[in-house]
Amino acid sequence: MLRLGMPVVGVTDIPRAVAFWTEALDLVASQERASETWRTLDHADGSGRALGLLRSDSPAEPRPRLHLDLFTDSAEEQHREVRRLLALGARSVDWDHYPPEPDFVVLADPDGNI
């Protein structure tokens, strides 16, 4: 049976990406197949893989065809999480496709991935 494994994000700096994503999503960096060009991040509760990081020299796409949606349980929690992610190195994205009164915020990771 076919199943989705995990999303893989292209990054220019593996250690920086590991630091950001482990802190952002409470993940744990796996040593399995770890290298200068690859790192797997697992769920902290041991339930499996969560995210792959692949070293890439190509720039992040300004309007990628695939992105990650991260959810919170309330607008207040969303505001707290956005501030926390910005403090970790994420950046706000000047995105011109917000609907009136959006319930989401577009951020980029330290590599510019939206």
Question: How should these model regions be labeled?
Answer:
Residues 2, 8-50:
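Core segments of cupin and vicinal oxygen chelate
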Residues 13-15, 63, 68-111:
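Vicinal oxygen chelate
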Residues 28, 52, 91-95:
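A short linear hydrophobic-aromatic micro-motif
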Residues 42, 52-54, 69:
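Residues in well-ordered beta-strands of folded domains
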Residues 46-48, 61-65:
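Short connector loops at helix/strand junctions that flank enzyme active sites
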Residues 49-54, 106:
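Conserved beta-strand in the GNAT
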